[in-house]
Amino acid sequence: MHSANIREEEEKYYLSRAKQQNQQLIVPPLNFSMIAPGIYRSGFPNPKSHPFLLQLKLRTIIYVFDGDCQPYHQEFIQNNSINYKHFRVAANKEPFEEMDHGLVAEILAEVLDTRNHPLLLHCNRGIRRVGSLVGCIRKLQGWAMTAIFDEYQRFSGTKIRISDQEFIEVFRHPVYIDPQFKPPWLDIE
């Protein structure tokens, strides 16, 4: 028997076993990754990714985008008693549009509050807005700017926006984090 035929037979076998055991394929949302223990990032979750999200036992979902949430996602959030926060955040675009520094500080305070963990932070594609916010978290963690930009570029691929990187670099707005609910991996006062 040829190796291609063997692989096809194995695939058929495992698919039939999964059906027999009533298992679903687990599909993470676009650009999903862990930022830090209890904090995840992604693009907009679709219904196929909901079983994956259930495994995370999310307490909070934060959506950062200037548009509305999809009804199927709102239903998922309500049906699973997940705390939902929607911040209408504009994208960083040259030459005059920039994320609001005060709003970013407010979002970071929510993301870093352990009472909200486990938490998913997402925008539509999980690239620009979330990438900028993650870059600001990395600054708070004391990462080097080159490491921050490297992480940003891993998620943005060819869609790098210099304005996002500039925003991360100049962000200095104070972020209030209650010391009682600060994550143990964040070493700031």
For each predicted feature, which ranges?
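Cys-dependent protein tyrosine phosphatase-like superfamily
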Residues: 1-121, 125, 132-189
